[in-house]
Amino acid sequence: MLRISSFLCVALSIFSIAADAATASLIEQLTDLSKRFSTAIIYNTSLLAGLTVEPSTQTTLEQTLDLWLTPRQLSWQKTASGIVIFQTATSVPAPAISIPETNNTQVIEEVTVTESLPTPSNGDAYNRNYQQAINYAQQIKSNYVGQSEIAVGAMLNQLPAENLAEALQAVPGISITRDRGEALNINAMGLGAEYQLTLFNGHRLANTENVRNSNQYGQQHRFDIFSAGLFSNIAVYKTTNSSLPSGAVGATVNLLSDDPLAYQDNNLQVMLTTAALEGEQNLQPSFGLTGNAKTADGNLAVMIKMNYENRLQRQFQFETWHWGENGGAPQPYQWPDINKNILVPTDGLALTIENEDRTRATYYGALAWQATERLKLNTLWFRSDTDFSFDEHRISINPQSQSAQAQVNDENNSLNQFVFNAVNAKTSREESNLYYANQTIQVDANWQPSAHLPLTLSPFYSSSKANSKTKEPITRVHVATSPMQADVALQNTSVDNFNFTSNLGLVSSYSHISQMSKRTINVLNEVQEWGIDSHFSAENSWGLQALDIGFLHSTQSYHYARKDISLSPSALEQLPNLDGRWLEPIANQFSAGFMNAEVQPWLIPKSDLLQLYDIDLPFAEMNESDRLNSYKVSFASKEGYISSQWQFEQVTLSTGLRYSNTLSETQGSQLTKTGGVAPINSSNNDSAWLPSVNLKWQPSQYWQWRAGFNRALNRPNYSDLNPKLHVNSGGLPYAELGNPNLQPVIANTSTLSVNWQQQSVSAQLLGFNHHMNNFIVEQAASFNYQGQHYNSLQRTNDGQAQVNGLQASSQWQLPQYSQWFLQSQLSASITHINKADVSTSAGNHFKVEGVSDWTGNLRFLVSDKKWQAAFNINYRSDFLEQRDISNNASSYVEDYTSTDLSFSWFYSANASLRLDMFNATNETLTRTAKTDYASSLMKAEEFGRRVVVSLSLRI
């Protein structure tokens, strides 16, 4: 579906040997034919070796194949992966073609694929056989000139993964960022999620946004809207491709839909799934359906996919929000007789139970029409609807130093034991119902104006819209505890004690309701793109092979609206006294591996007290705070490109140049000098020339060397452009200010790699270096708001950054067979970042946020005809999550290893049963607050193991 010209712009690098004028090698002629018509041609090399043909004067692909193959008892047939050539059986009709599924087949040795990257199609053999999917992906990668990775079929759906981001961990160099135990964003090429770009058939996707709190991801794509098996082909460009939209310094992930016309038969596949969280009895059902149909003449085809999923999650957390050096902490949080460099908590210490109930429905429809031999029309509709319900229970302590004692952990230079004699504590409940929707519509055409001219024109239109909102206002209710003593003791990665002397199960342990508030957030992100791509293939075995020219008009709009309201202090005082009508016990005992002592149950406010007691808390017109937190950002881009590919003996050269001109506009509100709020509109125009040069040298059959230079740009996050004022609600007083004048980050990236590939083993070593100008960094200044002095933090383009690293990967089909299994595959990848440093004009030096020094993935799969078992291990070393330039300590995510297991039983070709276990080791994810001299436990999270059972039926 939607064969986009980005995959047609690179010609195949198969080496040619000159033939005499009368005849030429059939293999050479097929190679030229593949390049001329931009079509994959798959054949057994030994079948065609030594055959020669006369150059064809026919004008169509079909006529040429018939002319060359029929006299030699050869036939051809279109399949999902391209045109397959096979030997005609004597007196027997030609069979339907698929790549053999024999476990020991060496596909790379036997099959030649004349295509640079996968077309948007779905090969059945690659979906069901992991080894063949690996081999096919390796072959495609081998033919591409630049730095890329391919994931097809079984690589995405035969290893355990809860969503598409987790499936993408099979791609060397990609790591993930987790939220609530599930992958949310991807990281690649030594850079965090904000430097990656996700495309759908070569076009930008609108992004859903976090609306549960004030954190905003902006252009960081949230992968929790995609199930793991939704796509069968994914291309990951590790360096820029001139024919694709600009916007990524890191990797560009291109999600490719299926081509309905590629399927030979009508099919219907149903998947029934149930899941359960460890220790829970509630089963979570899921349902999936995939179907395709084609008319008798084979010119019109349709495909539909539908998936419904329910997910229950319970997460146990110890969390703090801010730690700072004692000497710079606010007065209530300073501890006397303690060194000023000792880390102390400047905000709450809390235990939290987070209950999540999520339902996700995904719909996908594609229609393809081969109107004429030279004209094909494609349409696609995709929609994802996700509902989240959160019920969060928390008991927290305000760690003020008055009437309290503390002990210093000399090893970490931080406070780690606290005794609060008259503790300032509260129990809280937050309830939220959130809605995330993404809808994408795409239309394109592939038209060859003349049968005598190898030119293809591909006009396109894409519209993507994402809405993220609170279905009902988020409600927060805080209840203060009565005076009592509390004890807290922390270790580096665990909690020894979090206890209160009074019985928290009694209503008498609580004094009054201290806060009732509501919040609504509505975010609308829209992307529209239209343009045309053109591809010209030259019929030369030397020199120019392909030329691509295109134009893109793209508009992105982002509207963030937030409103807050709280019950006034006077209204809170008028509420009735607390009794059993207001509070109820927590439904689940707090139990986590990082907790070294039993936690007594506590009471929480009853669900939805505002409605239960008719407490009127309506939203009025937007106040100053609402206007400061709401904003609009839009980008309007016009881009054009030209790219070419050249063949010289053992060297293939790909060059490209893209021009981007973008008008950015920001609408918001900003404080005036007199303390009022005034609207502000800002616009900026940026343009950039983005060249790319990639070289591939193949000195022998098994070795390939690649070198490249690319320039790319990365636009600022939407929230950074908002001329906002966000005042921190806890810890040190500081304010965040937006900057609508931010410029895009410009990066020059150079790469060098070597690939070694044999029948059953392949390996790659890649070195890369990013040099980034206009790097966005935070700067601090003094600010006064409503009589309070704040340190203001504002992002500027004052930085320069350099990131370089090495990436090694290997695929190995193990030469071990037994009566128990026929195939075993080991895949491994590791990335080491040697340098990830930022420098500013003021002489400051620090690390790039979101970058781990080490990431790795290990996958092992063993199978027989009737079963398959696999494990997937992913590792990510500690990294700087958020740098703090005020007195607060920076936050780091500690190293984390996730292990997922899978077992499948194939009853028949049409029925299979699968068991997955996610987070098998149930490792705790921890965050640490750090300065140059001290560290302390900041947060610990435990997600629990999840077991999923799936039944797949094909009709």
Could you tell me what each predicted segment is?
Residues 762, 767-772, 776-783, 788-883, ...:
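Gram-negative outer-membrane beta-barrel transporters
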Residues 423, 427-430, 436-438, 625, ...:
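Outer-membrane beta-barrel signature, preferentially recognizing the C-terminal barrel domain
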Residues 19-95:
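N-terminal export/assembly leaders
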Residues 136-141, 145-148, 165-208:
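Extracytoplasmic beta-strand/coil segments of soluble accessory domains associated
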Residues 30, 34-37, 89-157:
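Short, acidic, small-residue-rich periplasmic hinge/interaction motif at the N-terminus
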Residues 213-220, 229-236, 243-334, 355-363, ...:
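Outer-membrane beta-barrel translocator/receptor signature
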